[in-house]
Each structure stands twice: as structure tokens, then as C-alpha cells.
Amino acid sequence: MRASILVLFIVATVSLSIAQQAPPQGINYQAVVYDIEGSQMPGVDAYDLIMANKQISVRFTILQSDPNGPEIYKESHSTTTDEYGLFSLVIGQGTQQSAGDFSSIDWGSGYHFLKVDIDKTGGSNFVTLSNQQFWSVPYA
């Protein structure tokens, strides 16, 4: 009887430890790429400006403290858009270009910003698209 209780306790402990694994190391990122040269007209259909089935390069940089703060992580991706100009990437799974790796980012040490750069030709001549602060997201 005592051995059965011990085995049951061990199985329950192992099951709980497997169920409580660490969250995944990555951030999903998705966007649609348009080939807009000049200004966009409000209310005009931009469907024919979508960069469908094109090879592009995307670079993600995580900055600390403010939008011009020190770079703590940088990576690049080479990907192809789909028929709607859509691409989906996971930040943390690209080609690392910084000294620190994604898993070593201390998210609790102040504000963090994500700078997104793109090269619409698939090369390394990047243009900055955005530089936005990270905000908390619940994880279950």
C-alpha cells in the first residue's frame, strides 16, 4: 500500500513538471507588404500594390529604455510573401546578428522597443518601417 502511494506521488509530480514547461522563446510577427512609392490616397483600393509572392528580408532589433536606446538583440529573416503579400515570422528564430541571444533578454529591466526594418528586394539594404514599444500580453 505504501509503495503504491509513493508511485502515485512520483507519477503526479512528474506529470505536473511536464505540464508546467517554460513558455516558448519567440514572438509571433505578421505583416502585409505593399509596394507604395509616394503617397497613398485614402479610400483607394491598394490591392494592386500588394507585393505577392516576393522574396523579402526583414530585420528585427530590440532596443532597451527608449526608441533610440541600446540594441540588446538583433536578427534577420529571409522570407517570401504569400499571394496576399502576407508574411509570418517568429522573432527569436531568425539569423542572430547581436552578441546576446533572445533567451537572455531581461524583459523585466525597463522598457523595450521593437524596431522593424525591411528590404523589399530580399537583400540587406534595409529601410525602417516602425519602432514601437512592447506592451504586456497575457500568457496562459
Q: Where are the model-predicted features located?
A:
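Bacterial N-terminal signal peptides
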Residues: 4-15
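Family-positioned intrinsically disordered, low-complexity linker/tail segments enriched in G/S/T/P
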Residues: 6, 18-140
